[in-house]
């Protein structure tokens, strides 16, 4: 009787099937992770704008700047995945995604909207209590929305 060395055909087929199942489960999760990583760049781009708007809202004594005049907007790409940054009259920010090679993301927007203590747009001289990020529907004081599916947004930006 000969001693068997190596794997039999059945054992190899089982191993290949297991690897295939693991790949089928892991690949979509990895793809979602890379999309979230790319979108975190949009949140980072809005962060400097958010700081400036918060300072203006808390310290200004005159009239609030109008849409596009908060000093942090950009009509041209500012980084690899950021196409442009816009603001509205209430200080809400929206950032457009680009170059992610995904139709669910490219050309779509992520919004950050300042909220006062009453969950409405903050008034001049009032502290910004929180920033609402990733809102799929308009909130009081701003028409900006996030139209990127929430599963692709970073955890800190899911409404």
Label the model's feature ranges.
Residues 32-73:
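Conserved hydrophobic/amphipathic alpha-helical signal-anchor segments
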Residues 1-41, 45, 49:
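N-terminal single-pass transmembrane signal-anchor helix
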Residues 58-159:
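Periplasmic/extracellular, small/polar-rich flexible segments of pilin-like filament-forming proteins
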């Amino acid at each position: 009787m000969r001693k068997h060395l190596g794997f039999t055909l059945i054992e190899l087929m089982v191993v290949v099937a297991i690897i295939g199942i693991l790949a089928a489960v892991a690949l979509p999760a990895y793809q979602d992770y890379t999309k979230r990583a790319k979108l975190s760049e949009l949140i980072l781009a809005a962060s400097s704008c958010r700081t400036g708007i918060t300072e203006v809202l808390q310290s200004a004594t005159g009239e609030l700047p109008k849409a596009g005049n908060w000093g942090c907007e950009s009509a041209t790409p500012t980084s690899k995945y950021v196409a442009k940054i816009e603001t509205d009259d209430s200080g809400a920010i929206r950032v457009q995604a680009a170059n992610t090679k995904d139709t669910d993301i490219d050309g779509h927007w992520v919004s950050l909207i300042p909220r006062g203590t009453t969950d409405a747009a903050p008034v001049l001289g009032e502290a910004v209590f929180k920033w609402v990020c990733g809102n799929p529907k308009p909130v009081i004081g701003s028409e900006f929305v996030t139209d990127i599916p929430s599963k692709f947004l970073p955890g800190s930006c899911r409404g």
